[in-house]
């Protein structure tokens, strides 16, 4: 299935691989000649006949149709290890979904005894400046807050000043990238602080270009979620700090949680930038059924349309994995139709 979803499906949906720097999703004769010589990733689309092994695959492929903008999806059943992906190996803008990795990098320092959850640091508040006027956007120090609160608001409220506060403490983007590499996750890169990322947003259209700065693949983000959830990367206490913050997320109510049944718990982190919306998280159902999902949507005409696409894909992923695992939905009884009368 992964071979089809990672290759055949990409072509079947009309998607094209991109090179490392921001480039249009097109090729010309010069690029084709260069590609032939040096084996780069930019290639003319090949023709494939879409073959689906299951109706689950077909449904996700239909929902992730990229005709109006690239859509990347990756998900894994955390109980069985079964995976599904569409453009799962292609880079998408991280936006604020990177904040989970920033929190994890800080919590490692807590476990090493260098800091604690009560250590206080100042918020880093952006100072108005023109786009691209400096390598890094200027910031000023704001109120001091304990690290535990910084982590909670950077995830649950997507606070940029809180994120940049901890990003500076851990050693900047390079330190977060290093933490990810040490966990075995390669297709992830933070290159700027959030203040700079937001100030300079809009340089490229993510629906037609790939900017390798501040980007990751959906598969990489699912690997991050899986490792955190299963306790592979951090201690049980640190793991719970992140999951609790994700469970309190206030942003993205129209994304992953929007179409979920009331009996599931969603722990997630959203991301939004120019012409792109994303949501990554853990969906826990009854009987311990849990999946990790990463959904990155570009284009589609408007933010509301992107959010609706995320919601429908997330529900289809949950239902598809639950059905394959034989997880029954809890029966909800009305006041006039309960067992025994």
Regions found by a protein language model. Give the residues of each.
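Bacterial N-terminal signal peptides that target proteins for export
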Residues: 1-11
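Bacterial N-terminal signal peptides
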Residues: 10-20
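Structured C-terminal helix/loop/strand segments within mature extracytoplasmic catalytic/sensor domains
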Residues: 26-59, 63, 168-169, 173, ...
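A short, well-structured edge-of-sheet supersecondary motif
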Residues: 55-88, 283
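Mid-domain, small-residue-enriched loop/turn segments at the edges of structured enzyme/sensor domains
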Residues: 70, 143, 151, 164-225
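Acidic helix-start/capping segments at beta-turn-to-alpha-helix junctions
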Residues: 78-79, 117-135, 170-171, 194-198, ...
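Active-site SXXK
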Residues: 81, 93-123, 293
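Active-site-proximal loop and beta-strand segments within enzyme catalytic domains
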Residues: 108-153
């Amino acid at each position: 299935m992964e071979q089809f979803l990672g290759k055949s499906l990409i072509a079947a949906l009309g998607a094209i691989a991109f090179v490392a720097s921001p480039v249009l999703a097109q090729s010309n004769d010069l690029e084709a000649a260069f590609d032939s010589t040096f084996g780069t990733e930019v290639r003319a689309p090949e023709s494939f006949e879409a073959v689906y092994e299951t109706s689950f695959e077909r449904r996700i492929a239909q929902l992730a149709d990229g005709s109006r903008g690239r859509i990347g999806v990756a998900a894994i059943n955390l109980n069985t290890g079964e995976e599904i992906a569409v453009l799962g190996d292609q880079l998408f803008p991280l936006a604020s979904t990177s904040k989970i990795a920033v929190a994890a990098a800080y919590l490692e320092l807590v476990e090493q005894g260098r800091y604690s959850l009560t250590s206080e640091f100042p918020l880093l508040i952006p100072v108005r400046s023109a786009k691209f006027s400096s390598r890094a956007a200027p910031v000023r120090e704001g109120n001091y807050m304990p690290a535990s609160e910084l982590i909670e608001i950077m995830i649950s409220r997507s606070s940029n000043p809180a994120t940049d506060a901890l990003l500076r403490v851990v050693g900047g983007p390079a330190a977060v990238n290093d933490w990810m590499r040490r966990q075995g996750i390669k297709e992830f890169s933070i290159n700027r602080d959030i203040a700079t990322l937001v100030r300079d947003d809009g340089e490229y259209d993510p629906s037609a270009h790939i900017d390798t700065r501040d980007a990751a693949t959906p598969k990489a983000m699912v690997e991050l979620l899986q490792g955190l959830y299963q306790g592979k990367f951090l201690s049980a206490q640190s793991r719970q700090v992140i999951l609790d913050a994700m469970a309190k997320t206030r942003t993205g109510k129209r994304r992953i949680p929007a179409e979920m049944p009331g009996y599931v718990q969603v722990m997630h982190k959203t991301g939004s930038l120019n012409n792109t919306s994303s949501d990554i998280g853990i969906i826990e159902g009854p009987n311990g059924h849990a999946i990790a999902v990463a959904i990155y949507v570009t284009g589609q005409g408007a933010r509301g349309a992107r959010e609706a696409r995320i919601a429908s894909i997330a529900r289809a992923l949950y239902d598809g994995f639950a059905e394959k695992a034989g997880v029954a939905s809890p029966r909800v009884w009305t006041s006039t139709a309960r067992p025994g009368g």
